[in-house]
């Protein structure tokens, strides 16, 4: 009897990620939260910022991080700057811009609990939120594994391959863009099948916009569609009032 395929997806532990991120969780047997790679010394990335609809426009919402260190550090060592009132600021922005969304009363208390997680660790904060959101939209959060807990080293493609092998994966679910012939050959040489995600962003009803804005945090879909229909959107299913 042939061995069953074990699909692995790998991504940094993002801050309230977009729908495509959760589609990867839905399609993978193991979803590895890559907290063992470097956080940029300057600026930010999807680990501490994401876009919400604010004043009818896609705007960055950011969790500030401590910048007192003098070297590049892995995400797992990055601390949130809890000396600033960023939690209050984000919640006020949500109240102001999503207060009239159809599912605001259901989602806001849930979101408040996630944002008010008192941890200093950006990894702990994001991993907890990703797991809670996965549960809320009926995804299996037990498939989430932190990369830093695995015996896997290397850089770039080599690190990805070693992480896939560390959990016994036989296939790697990657984003829609091609990784390049030479990189693909590395996976093939290790007997790992490449699967391209090709997630088609759904168009769902949004509050206070004339034209749909894609690529926002899952929070936008939750506020406008609720837990159940957001789960359907993640799975690629249609919901009332939405179109692909």
Task: Pin down the residues of each PLM region.
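Residues lining hydrophobic/aromatic ligand-binding pockets adjacent to catalytic sites
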Residues: 1-244
